[in-house]
């Protein structure tokens, strides 16, 4: 959430300079494109990677706490919202942030979490055709996006895009995962959700 961002970055900074982790490039961080601060957080992460002389794994998501962020801002009487209030702004922000992450391959290992075919294809073209292993990866939730990523993972000779996809599967007790499940249902149950709209056989392709 927005109110935990700064303390999360403080912890990340300490981890990056932890002597026992020197030379290890497995430190990662998740950023949410619907946050208005996201591009500036990326600038900070690039600077941190430079200062700590390591390559950071950065997972870019669109964001799953929209309802709670809006509610918190209203309850606290904030002048504005920390997140974009229209989905189209988040979609544009995601691509802008993806471009920033791809621009520094020596410092950032981008991990693009999306189930949206438009977003995926845009990133594919932004990254260029000179792909090499370890340049970047896509990510999807376990149980979602398989039809899309079946066209991504695999050899070019087989008609695939030859790009890697990591499957994200949360693990824990039902008490821990219940809130996570509710957020996923809200996100993908929305009328504007790509996952929801693509399942509608009556929806014209032009509108999709």
Model feature map: region roles:
Residues 1-208:
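Positively charged, amphipathic and often flexible ligand-engagement surfaces
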């Amino acid at each position: 959430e927005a109110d935990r961002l700064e303390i999360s970055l403080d912890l990340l900074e300490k981890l990056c300079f932890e002597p026992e982790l020197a030379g290890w490039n497995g430190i990662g961080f998740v950023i949410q494109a619907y946050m208005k601060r996201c591009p500036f957080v990326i600038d900070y992460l690039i600077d941190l990677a430079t200062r700590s002389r390591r390559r950071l794994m950065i997972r870019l998501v669109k964001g799953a706490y929209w309802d709670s962020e809006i509610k918190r801002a209203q309850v606290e009487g904030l002048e504005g919202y920390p997140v974009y209030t229209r989905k189209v702004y988040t979609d544009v922000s995601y691509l802008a942030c993806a471009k920033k992450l791809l621009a520094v391959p020596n410092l950032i290992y981008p991990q693009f979490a999306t189930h949206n075919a438009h977003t995926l294809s845009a990133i594919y073209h932004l990254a260029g055709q000179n792909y090499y292993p370890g340049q970047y990866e896509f990510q999807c939730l376990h149980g979602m996006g398989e039809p899309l990523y079946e066209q991504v993972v695999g050899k070019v000779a087989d008609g695939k895009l030859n790009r890697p996809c990591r499957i994200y599967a949360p693990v824990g007790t039902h008490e821990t995962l219940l809130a996570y499940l509710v957020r996923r249902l809200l996100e993908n149950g929305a009328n504007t959700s790509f996952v929801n709209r693509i399942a509608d056989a009556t929806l014209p392709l032009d509108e999709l």
